[in-house]
Amino acid sequence: FEAHAGDIDWRLLAAMAYGGFSFFMALGRFSGDRIRQRASATQLLNGGTLLGLSGLVIALGLPWVWTGLLGFSLTGLGFSIVVPVLFSLAARLVPHRPDQGIAFIANTAVVGFLMAPPSIGFLAEHFGLDIALSLLIGLTLIAWIGTKILARRVKAGRATP
């Protein structure tokens, strides 16, 4: 019975981490327009990716259950504004052709949706879940670098914030 109870506890904790991520993702999306009125797109992308990155580092780098829950909640909040802002900026990157920028972001997202689960599963099977989820830290660092490149393009007048 105790083994079964332990199994239920771990499932509950995993659900709580996903629930925290989802709740704060929704909270950020619902308040995103209000936040967008006070900050530029590049500030939101930079802040969102850094908050998401911080959440992942907390969730994966600290050994306590509560830090995992906190970390994944922060990740959801940080990432909540990134995708809507990316789509907004993408629509303005190619003058008079918003469809091209939006299609690029949408296709990139589809590749991510198709590649991430099997990649994480493969890495988890061979190296452990902590190593597999660390892939997300690397990808978030790449996204953060991308926000810096985009900020430079905005300052140079090649994109609109």
Model-based region annotation:
Residues 28-40, 124-125:
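Helix-to-loop junctions at the C-terminal end of transmembrane segments
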Residues 43-58, 66, 137:
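Structural signature of the two symmetry-related core transmembrane helices
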